[in-house]
Every structure is written in C-alpha cells, then in structure tokens.
C-alpha cells in the first residue's frame, strides 16, 4: 500500500512539473502593458482593449464599422482590412476579447452572454447609439449573430468571414481535454500543439501585399502568451460557448432581414466550406464570396480580396 501511494505521489509530481513550468512565469496583465495607440474601456466584467481608426480624406460618412475577431487571434488580425474601410469614410473600432490580446482575463465563464455583453458594453462605453456595421471572423461570426439577435436595432449590416457554427463536435478522446483539472493541465502542457507554432495558418504563402506573413503573425500572436488567463479563457470558451452548431441562431437572423455578407474559403480546414450552404438555408438573402484557394486564414492571407468585397457591401448599405 505504501509503495502504491509513493508511486502515485511521484506520478503526480511528474505530471505537475510541466504544468508548473508553463505557468510559473506568466504575468498578470495591467494597463502598463497595453500599446499606447489603444486604450482600456472599463466594462462590467473588467477592462477591455480597444482602438479607433479614423477615416481619411473628405469622404467621411459618419458610420462605424466594428471588427470582432475569432477564438484565439486578437485584433491585429484585421491589419490588412482597416485602411480600405477608412478610405471609404468609415470609422473603424477594433477590440480584443476578454482573455485575449491586451484585454484583462477575468475568471468567469466565457459563454456567449459574456461576448455579447462585452460588445454591447464597449459600444455604450464609447457612446455609440446609432446602428453599426458588424464584421465577425470565425468565432466572431456567432458573436455578431447573437449580438444582432439581442440588439437588432443596433445592427446595420453583418459581414461574416469563415463563421463558426458549422463544425463537427468534439467527441471521444478529444472531449476529455475539456474536463475539469484534466483540461487545465492538458491545455497548458500541450499549448504549442493546440495553438502554437505550426497551427497559426493553413496557408504557408500569400502574394497579397497586405497579408500578414508568418513571422509577423507569430510575433504579434505570442505577445498575449506571457499573461495569465489566456489559456483559461480559450478552455472556458470551448466549455461554455457552443461554436459547433449555431444554426438555430442563424435561422433567427434570417427572419430579421438585415443585410448580410459572408466570405468563405473553399479549402477551409477549420469551418468547412459546406457550411456556406447551411448558412444560405438559414439566411436566404446572404451575399456569398467564395475564395477558391482560400483556407480559414483568408482574413489575413487574402485581405485585399476579402476587404474589397466587404467594402463594396458596406458602401451599398450606407444610409
């Protein structure tokens, strides 16, 4: 019996050491860490990082575009699209979700209510009461959808890029990596396998001059990894936010008759292109852009094509 206890104790130590190695040097984010070109907005659940981009020239239309990023990659992912919208006279607001980028990492459930609440809270904080154009990438798609479902009078148009909500659910062995204790250990110890080097992009090369290359992407992505709470926010999102099947919500959106656009890569290995047919069934009036060689990273690998199409859609839906 004593031998068994010793073996169990040693095994627990062996398992704990890699977790300790991954977490012991993490910092708690504070205001001194955020880039000077952005700011923190104090919301109900904590401080969230945001940044404004102002329109250029004389063609200012007074309308606002809000960009909502996806699961793990924060707001820098929009770098190749922002100028196009500003040049057309739109004000552009970007922000990092709680747990990502330069926002705080509150210890709460990262469910759809949190993401909707934080978007509404940011708009209120910035005193935006008129309708806005919402653009959501990957997980940002369902966030746009659930927000619009709750606040249809605040949404002027919806643009979705490879939107989540049409994926196969985790099952079997994969489902165990979200269980209490096991999940925390696994997501920290095997972080590089989940979101690390080699999993950032499906596309190894892009000739788009506005694309974010792999080195630049990794440099910006890794800035958030030094802070406590990033991994926990991802794990909590997987546990609390159903990103696999959002068809009921999309069907409800179809009844609102709000102008909707979607861009999808035919070779998307994260949210399969077949989801575009499901989305058209839910929202019959949706405008679809198919990128033949596009994967899940079209937002930053083909930003010129995606940006021009969305910009045309936005201009056609101005007041």
Language-model features: locations:
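Gly/Ala-rich beta-loop-alpha elbow adjacent to hydrolase catalytic centers
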Residues: 136, 140, 144
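Conserved alpha/beta-hydrolase catalytic His-Asp/Glu region
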Residues: 29, 189-255
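Alpha/beta-hydrolase fold catalytic core
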Residues: 1-63, 87-90, 247, 315-319
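Catalytic histidine-centered segment of alpha/beta-hydrolase-like enzymes
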Residues: 270, 294-307
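Active-site loop/oxyanion-hole signature of alpha/beta-hydrolase fold enzymes
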Residues: 43, 51-57, 97-135, 151, ...
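Flexible "cap/lid" loop of the alpha/beta hydrolase fold
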Residues: 149, 157-188
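Conserved HGGG/HGGXW glycine-rich cap/lid loop of the alpha/beta-hydrolase fold
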Residues: 53-102
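Short beta-strand/loop motif that positions the catalytic acidic residue
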Residues: 256, 262-264, 268
């Amino acid at each position: 019996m004593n031998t068994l206890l010793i073996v169990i104790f040693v095994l627990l130590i062996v398992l704990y050491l890699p977790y300790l190695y991954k977490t012991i040097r993490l910092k708690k984010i504070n205001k001194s860490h955020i880039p000077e070109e952005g700011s923190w907005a104090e919301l109900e659940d904590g401080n969230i990082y945001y940044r404004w981009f102002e329109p250029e020239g004389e063609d200012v239309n007074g309308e606002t575009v809000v960009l909502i990023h996806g699961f793990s990659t924060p707001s820098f992912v929009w770098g190749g699209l922002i100028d196009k919208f500003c040049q057309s006279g739109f004000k552009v607001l970007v922000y990092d979700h709680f747990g990502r980028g330069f926002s705080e990492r509150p210890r709460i459930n990262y469910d759809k209510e949190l993401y909707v609440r934080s978007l509404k809270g940011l708009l209120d904080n910035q005193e935006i009461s008129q309708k806005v154009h919402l653009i959501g990438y990957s997980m940002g798609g369902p966030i746009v959808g659930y927000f619009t479902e709750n606040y249809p009078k605040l949404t002027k148009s919806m643009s979705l890029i490879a939107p989540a909500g049409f994926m196969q659910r985790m099952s079997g062995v994969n489902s165990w990596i979200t269980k209490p204790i096991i999940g925390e250990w696994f997501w920290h110890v095997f972080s590089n396998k989940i979101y690390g080097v080699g999993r950032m992009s499906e596309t190894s090369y892009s000739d788009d001059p506005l694309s974010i290359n792999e080195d630049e992407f990794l440099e910006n992505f890794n800035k958030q990894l030094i802070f406590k709470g990033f991994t926990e926010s991802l794990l909590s999102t997987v546990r609390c936010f159903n990103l696999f099947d959002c068809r009921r919500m999309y069907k409800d959106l179809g009844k609102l008759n709000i102008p909707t656009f979607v861009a999808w890569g035919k070779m998307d290995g994260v949210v399969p292109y077949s989801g575009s047919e499901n989305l058209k069934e839910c929202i019959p009036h949706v405008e679809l852009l198919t990128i033949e060689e596009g994967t899940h990273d079209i937002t930053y690998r083909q930003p010129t094509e995606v940006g021009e199409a969305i910009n045309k859609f936005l201009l056609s839906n101005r007041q």
